[in-house]
Design a protein with these regions (language model features):
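Class I SAM-dependent transferase core
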Residues: 54, 58-99, 142, 500, ...
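Conserved SAM-binding loop of SAM-dependent methyltransferases across substrates and taxa
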Residues: 112-125
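S-adenosyl-L-methionine
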Residues: 132-170, 177
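Polybasic, low-complexity RNA-engagement segments
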Residues: 1-48, 304-516
Length: 516
């Protein structure tokens, strides 16, 4: 049930339309899945998924799920990064940006990662996705989700928007601000959204949203586009927020929210929600509960100037090529090191080092002298780690063998083109593995990002009992993979890694992700 403040406000704004607009089609919260173009097409997914699906009106890659008992986290395709489970109208904002391969894209408030996964799919592995989350625990969830989705070209930050604005002025071609909001569109989905709601919260979120929008304006390049979205109905956070932003930033114009897509959904904005400021509400978009979603607001803003030219497919901008070359040189210098093995490196050290590795690897990309160790780092010099990766890649991932690699302790990273900054980076590129007990051991992200390129695969299907066995952490019978490391797939999509010996696949699926 909505709060008294919410109902009184909305009845005053909507009058007789209140009951109609807030009349949801069902008593339970809407549920949906969005298919990743990094894996497949919506049609192929629908044909294989064995779900009760209906096409979503909010996104061409999304479906509404009509199964009350559906548990997305247990579906093998979820583990394979084929789809992301999200409320249907939440999938509507990312496509409005019109992202194209080769662009630099920022998701400024990205956790848990649903919209970032959509942006990554639009980039198709080309260009750069920077996904930021200010809250550390949520940033870790964001990193895990983007790894599961197999995103190969992401930088994951745990930063304040103001620091990003200072470090990367006019850097991005596209920016998404899915702002922290009062969550009025979450009332049916999360009871805590009701208990925490208040007029004071709305005011607080509106002030925070304004600050974040100002930071987004600073990092957007001339001619770039910004999409602002919320899952609330509060005027101060929606139409009023956009109107106030345009007053502060005359270099921006309000564009048609649907200008980058060839379909329509939802409704226009509301003229009595602008706080008395001028705004063409026909250009913004609202989704009401009666329209099949829990509620969303979106606006698209364009910065004055000429958009930067995009690089040719498979190529980089000149400055991006320089950043990659710098990363490669940093890797070569690390590879020439004569570091001594560290003794007394026990399991507790390994767990701690692995947590630090995701932070430290990017410092290696920036050419800094850090001493962060990855699991097993005490057992190999940088030169040995790089040589072990190249030997491993030549056998199992030949397409990756010649890519620039950065050595950090015992870990190896395939970097992305990103300039040197002091920002807190959790991951920049794909952390492919480390040397342990004298041998190269691949990371889970290597298989999710590049599993389709692996030369040795154990091929499962959705109905194969071995699929659930693998996801549960058990050994399975090897039928298609030869001895050695392999990528375990389901219907051709990568689940994770394993190692074949004696006709069995030893399970290397991460324990934290396994089915219980």
């Amino acid at each position: 049930m909505p709060t008294e403040y919410f109902e009184a406000r909305e009845r005053a704004l909507l009058g007789q339309r209140y009951e109609t607009l807030y009349a949801a089609p069902s008593d339970s919260a809407a549920r949906g899945v969005t298919v990743s173009a990094l894996r497949t097409t919506p049609g192929t997914f629908a044909a294989k998924a064995d779900m009760a699906l209906e096409p979503s009106p909010f996104c061409k890659a999304a479906f509404v799920v009509r199964e009350e008992t559906f548990k997305p986290g247990r579906h093998p395709y979820h583990h394979a990064g084929v789809f992301y489970s999200q409320e249907p109208s939440a999938a509507s904002a990312a496509p409005l940006l019109g992202v194209k391969p080769g662009m630099r894209v920022l998701d400024l408030c990205a956790a848990p990662g649903g919209k970032s996964s959509q942006l990554a799919a639009a980039l198709q592995g080309q260009g750069l996705l920077v996904s930021n989350e200010y809250v550390a625990a949520r940033a870790d969830i964001l990193k895990s989700n983007l790894e599961r989705m197999g995103v190969p070209n992401a930088v994951i930050l745990n930063e304040a928007p103001a620091r990003i604005a200072e470090a990367l002025p006019e850097f991005f071609d596209r920016v998404l601000v899915d702002a922290p909001c009062s969550g009025e569109g979450m009332f049916r989905k999360e009871a805590v959204a009701v208990t925490q709601h208040s007029e004071a919260l709305v005011k607080q979120c509106a002030e925070l949203g304004a600050q974040i929008l100002d930071c987004a304006a600073a990092v957007l390049a001339p001619g770039g586009q910004l999409v602002y979205s919320t899952c609330t109905f509060a005027p101060e956070e929606d139409e009023g927020q956009v109107a106030a932003f345009l007053q502060r930033h005359p270099e921006f114009t309000l564009a048609d929210a649907l200008g980058n897509v060839d379909y329509t959904f939802g409704s226009e904005g509301e003229a009595n929600r602008t706080g008395g400021l001028p705004l063409d509400v026909t250009r913004v978009r609202r989704v009401w509960p009666c329209q099949g979603g829990e509620g969303h607001f979106m606006a698209r803003l364009v910065k004055a100037g000429t958009p930067r030219a995009l690089p040719a497919p498979g190529e980089y901008r000149p400055e991006e090529q320089l950043w990659l070359e710098a990363a490669a040189q940093a890797g070569k210098k690390a590879g020439k090191g004569k570091g001594k093995p560290t003794k007394g490196f026990d399991k507790a050290d390994a767990r701690s080092a692995r947590r630090e590795a995701s932070r430290g690897c990017h410092e290696a990309v920036q050419g800094r002298n850090t001493r962060t160790r990855d699991a097993g780092a005490g057992e190999a010099t940088p030169a040995q780690s790089l040589a072990a990766w190249q030997e491993f890649a030549a056998r199992y991932f030949p397409a990756l063998a010649q890519r620039p690699a950065v050595v950090h302790g015992g870990g190896v990273l395939l970097p992305v083109p990103f300039p040197q900054t002091t920002l807190h980076v959790l991951r920049a590129g794909v952390f492919v593995g480390s040397v342990q007990k004298g041998r190269f051991v691949p990371e889970h992200h290597l298989f999710t990002a590049f599993g389709a390129q692996c030369t040795n695969r154990e091929e499962l299907t959705l109905t194969d009992p071995r699929t659930v066995e693998y996801l549960s952490g058990r050994e399975i019978e090897a039928r298609t993979a030869a001895d050695g490391w392999c990528c375990v797939t389901v219907d051709g999509w990568p689940l994770g890694g394993g190692k074949v010996s004696g006709g069995r696949v030893k399970n290397h699926y991460p324990k934290a992700l396994r089915l219980l």
